[in-house]
């Protein structure tokens, strides 16, 4: 990879010193990494300060790191925490930049082809570019990523070749600079100066780098010499001072040199000939005509413009790979001695394994029916075995490690059970199923009187809805967290729970990882003896742990018998509780309540996806999949209907129901046109 310019050490900022199990965990993790151990697991309970431990390990070893989280919300939470620990270093955020993404798809049963449709979040795109730049330029880099890290990214070799190096005193013609900027996909805009654009005023060129959000660079030429390079604020124009050199990175990760594009076109033509022969031989004349027309159009676009819609489907040729080779990803930008930390590994690891299979089945249909060449199958996320080969030294972090992590780590499972705050794991009670609803009503009233909160987890959506109605009818302030709610609204519901807008939150499988609410003093698990995924040992420990941040934490398991999963979960929780009690007695610690600011949670949610907050819809019941709409009477009604339709479209796209998503998209177009016409 490129030569590292910045070798600044990591400087950890914190008001706290490691305590409890943290010092021995930090020492052991660091020692294992120094000894070259490939896999180890940090078994850290809720509230034990796992992130602080990891931050100390990174600072102690002074090595770049990537933190993988299972979703955008937890990635944003980790990013915020790491940013606070390392304000002087490069802490970056790398998640999917799509607010909405509907991939190209074909439904043979109805002969429906759905074009790719996407909405890109400009802020997250800038953060992704900043992440790769930091990995290439700086040693003091921490990148917090979601599973987007295993998806194809532009080839780092092409990316590095395309950079524009500027140096004070260098001899370069103005036209050369402008031509190079155009190659990097920057556009000239002398009126609106924004990310990824440049403007020219006489012999002064201003460039707003694609990876920057608050700094632009000014090139002052004298004849054909760069007389001065300086940085300035693109909003106010105030100068940050002169710099001796500056590197302009491409506007996108997918930029490709002209020679590589021309080589790719020749290879695409050869594959097209082979594919046409196959379809003719199989008497599939419609597919033959379809692949010819679509591919020829793409070739012409690439020849003229250097890119085409869906250019990622030709990534095999553009990155110079052979058939079946893994795509370039964020891992290719990482320094070779980086550390990989997989947070909530019991969820994240299976996610990584499942990404390839889902993507493959959709693409195979496109190839079979002549919409794409077979080489499109190489535009894919990493296979799990490829991820294993590319992953550097790894730390798995979880309160309930999965079988994969335990097998890989062997004996290197580092316990972090003791909390510095002295807080104990919840007391567990088992009560009969026959009284669960009325007993829960009584418990909820007691907690509401003390200004405490309750989480309730059920087995089915129907039961969650019925229970919500029942509690509501009996005067309990209750909300239902369902699968139709997007990431940001989910965070806002949790915020409302913390603020006391309501007292009881009912859910199914949403009340587990990363839901840290200090105000929750009771977790109620209904039908705890129904063995299965939602009532496995791991699920039960995670759910019980939601009450571990409160001084009066309690978990009630409603069950008529004790399953093996329940027995293991209760034994493990009691083991942790006893260890904490012993530690508290030995060190004279009195458990202290957590005073986490409510605002922090909301900021985290908005950081994950700012645009989606417009989709806020506060109904307590699950959203209906389809709805009939009366003609809107005013602008406000139009906006409400548009938001409702957008939510449904996002949901269908997320569930891979592309046909339904496309139908709603068309409905949205009509509604917007009608809105413009009426107004």
Curated annotation (Swiss-Prot):
Report keywords, A-Z. ATP-binding, Cytoplasm, DNA damage, DNA excision, DNA repair, Excision nuclease, Nucleotide-binding, SOS response
List the ranges annotated as motif Beta-hairpin: 97-120
Q: Name one GO biological process term.
A: SOS response
GO CC: one term? cytoplasm
Top-level taxon of origin:
Bacteria
Q: Which residues form the Helicase C-terminal domain?
A: 436-589
Question: Which PROSITE patterns does this entry report, sorted A to Z?
Answer: HELICASE_ATP_BIND_1, HELICASE_CTER, UVR
Q: Which positions does UniProt annotate for ATP binding?
A: 44-51
Q: Which GO terms describe its molecular function?
A: ATP binding; ATP hydrolysis activity; DNA binding; excinuclease ABC activity
Q: What does this protein do?
A: The UvrABC repair system catalyzes the recognition and processing of DNA lesions. A damage recognition complex composed of 2 UvrA and 2 UvrB subunits scans DNA for abnormalities. Upon binding of the UvrA(2)B(2) complex to a putative damaged site, the DNA wraps around one UvrB monomer. DNA wrap is dependent on ATP binding by UvrB and probably causes local melting of the DNA helix, facilitating insertion of UvrB beta-hairpin between the DNA strands. Then UvrB probes one DNA strand for the presence of a lesion.
What's the entry's take on its domains?
The beta-hairpin motif is involved in DNA binding.
In its UniProt entry, what is this protein called?
Answer: UvrABC system protein B
């Amino acid at each position: 990879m490129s030569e590292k310019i910045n070798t600044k050490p990591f400087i950890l900022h914190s008001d706290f010193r490691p305590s409890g199990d943290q010092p021995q965990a930090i020492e052991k993790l660091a020692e294992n990494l120094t000894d070259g151990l490939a896999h180890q697991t940090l078994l850290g309970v809720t509230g034990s300060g796992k992130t602080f431990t990891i931050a100390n390990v990174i600072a102690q070893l002074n090595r770049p790191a990537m933190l993988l989280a299972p979703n955008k919300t937890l990635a944003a939470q980790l990013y915020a925490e790491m940013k606070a620990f390392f304000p002087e270093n490069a802490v970056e955020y790398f998640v999917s930049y799509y607010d909405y993404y509907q991939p190209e798809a074909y439904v043979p049963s109805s002969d429906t082809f759905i074009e790719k449709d996407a909405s890109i979040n400009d802020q997250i795109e800038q953060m992704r570019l900043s992440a790769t730049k930091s990995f290439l330029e700086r040693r003091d880099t921490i990148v917090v990523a979601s599973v987007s890290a295993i998806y194809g990214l532009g080839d780092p070799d092409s990316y590095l070749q395309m950079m524009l190096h500027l140096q004070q005193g260098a001899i370069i013609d103005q036209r050369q600079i402008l031509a190079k900027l155009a190659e990097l996909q920057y556009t000239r805009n002398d009126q609106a100066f924004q990310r990824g654009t440049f403007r020219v005023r006489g012999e002064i060129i201003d460039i707003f780098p694609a990876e920057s959000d608050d700094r632009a660079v000014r090139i002052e030429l004298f004849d054909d010499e760069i007389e001065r390079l300086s940085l300035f604020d693109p909003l106010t124009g105030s100068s940050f001072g002169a710099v001796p050199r500056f590197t302009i990175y491409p506007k996108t990760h997918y930029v490709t040199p002209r020679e590589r594009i021309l080589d790719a076109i020749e290879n695409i033509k050869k594959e097209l000939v082979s594919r046409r022969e196959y379809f003719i031989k199989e008497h599939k004349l419609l597919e033959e005509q379809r692949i010819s027309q679509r591919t020829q159009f793409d070739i012409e676009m690439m020849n003229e413009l250097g890119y085409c819609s869906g250019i990622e489907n030709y990534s095999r040729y553009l990155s110079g790979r052979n058939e079946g080779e893994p795509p370039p990803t964020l891992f290719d930008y990482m320094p070779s001695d980086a550390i990989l930390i997989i947070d909530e590994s019991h969820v994240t690891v299976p996610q990584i394994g499942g990404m390839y299979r889902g993507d493959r089945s959709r693409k195979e249909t496109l190839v079979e029916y002549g919409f794409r060449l077979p080489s499109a199958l190489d535009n894919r996320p990493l296979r799990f075995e490829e991820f294993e080969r590319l992953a550097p030294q790894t730390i798995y972090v979880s309160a309930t490690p999965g079988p994969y992590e335990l097998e890989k780590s062997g004996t290197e499972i580092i316990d972090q059970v003791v909390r510095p705050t002295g807080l104990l794991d919840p007391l567990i009670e088992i009560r009969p199923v026959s009284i669960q609803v009325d007993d829960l009503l009584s418990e909820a009233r007691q907690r509401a009187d003390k200004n405490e909160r309750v989480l309730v987890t059920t087995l089915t959506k129907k039961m969650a809805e019925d229970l919500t109605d029942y509690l509501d009818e009996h005067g309990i302030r209750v909300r239902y967290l369902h699968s139709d709610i997007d990431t940001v609204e989910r965070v806002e519901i949790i915020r409302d729970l913390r603020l006391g807008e309501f007292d009881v939150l009912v859910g199914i499988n949403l009340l587990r990882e990363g839901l840290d609410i200090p105000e929750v003093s009771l977790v109620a698990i209904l039908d705890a003896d129904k063995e299965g995924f939602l009532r496995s040992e791991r699920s039960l420990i995670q759910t019980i742990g939601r009450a571990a941040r409160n001084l009066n934490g309690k978990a009630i398991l409603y069950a008529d018998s004790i399953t093996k999963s329940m027995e293991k979960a209760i034994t493990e929780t009691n083991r942790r509780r006893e260890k904490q009690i012993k530690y508290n007695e030995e060190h004279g610690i009195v458990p202290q309540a957590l005073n986490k600011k409510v605002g922090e949670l909301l900021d985290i949610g908005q950081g994950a996806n700012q645009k989606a907050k417009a989709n806020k819809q506060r109904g307590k019941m699950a959203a209906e999949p389809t709805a009939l709409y009366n003609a809107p009477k005013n602008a406000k009604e139009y906006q409400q209907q548009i938001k409702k339709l957008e939510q449904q479209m996002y949901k269908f796209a997320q569930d891979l129901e592309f046909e339904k998503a496309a139908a709603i998209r068309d409905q949205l177009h009509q509604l917007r046109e009608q809105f413009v016409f009426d107004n």
